[in-house]
């Protein structure tokens, strides 16, 4: 039945920035949830409604992969249950290892099989056929979330067992729940919702069970909260504006430079790289803003994922501001288990590089992603060594110089992140260093014609594209470096007439762009 309904509707697109989502799916999901909260006799029905709505949202992309998501949820919950119940501790560790291997294998099969086959054929001159697998949507995200859950379940049990033994030896009542009480239908629904909750399912933020599951249990979140709805609408409007007005239109410049041009002059290359740097930021942060806003409709507070990353004065500061939830995962579940800062300095550098190599490879199966991760790992190691030197010699770099170095490194590294292959990356980099000539002229005739063609198809031509390059750059600079970011507005938890007016204006402009142009997917859907 579900497959039939979805197949009929597949002519439409179910993305945050589409009319079908904004005017149909979201209102139905919202109303259904709070109606059930108010009138359902069984308190599990509202949670079940959200789980089913989230699964429908996921299945809309490709219903064939719905069993994969459901199977992953059931399997990981079962493994966590066995970790909780099994004695002795050695068997707990075996269940944890089994769960980790299964999750990594599932992700590796879909994401990296073709990459390894291609490179194996290249090295050994063999002719194994690639499988041309379609990457299941969100698999990189829900896999990480469940890996963290398994590891934390294991660590929590390691802490609980000595405490329980201590209580027994003291002949005191055991306050901790016995292992058999771990499973319940309510707890399973909380877990399923933690993994599948549709605002964050597809591209994050990478949520942690400790910050999500208690919110699903909180009875105060079961009632309509008009302040949360108003604030959520405001944050959603910011994200929608970032996506459809800025990111989608900046993409035209980046796509031309990376995919269409055969060579790039100095100005063209820098315009290409900067366009992608801002496109990626506004696209991904726009998605996260929209996810946070939607979460607030349901009284669920998702973690902040961006904090003005392009204002960073060093690469460490950048990773405290960019994709914050991924940085948290890499730190807590890779860097610290490898020794963190407690090991010898050379080992710390090795760990930094290794962690970011894995982080780069997590983003995509390609040498360009590996190089991007390697560059960031090396940069973090260099920054760490530099920080030690500055403390020793009492030297401080001027802030403007520190910002210029940091931003330009980030912009350069994004070239590898965006390029389809090394040849495309080198094409842009050659232009950026002036190997194709340093010219202060306008874009080539081909690029100009392309931009003019884009302009003619836009309703907002007279407002936004009278001088496309200049006005878009001014808008991006103002938003990125001058205005308060959405995380500050989110944390303020207050609505006033300025925010209300801004939300109405941003939504109006966003809707104009939605109906004036074709919808595009979010960039991080590809990862």
Curated annotation (Swiss-Prot):
It is an enzyme of class 2 (transferase). Pfam families: MBOAT (PF03062). Disruption phenotype: Cells lacking this gene contain a greatly reduced amount of acetylated muropeptides in the bacterial PG, and are more susceptible to lysozyme killing than wild-type. The active site is at residue 363. Belongs to the membrane-bound acyltransferase family. PANTHER family: ACYLTRANSFERASE, TEICHOIC ACID D-ALANYLTRANSFERASE. This is Peptidoglycan O-acetyltransferase. It comes from Helicobacter pylori (strain ATCC 700392 / 26695) (Campylobacter pylori). The gene is patA.
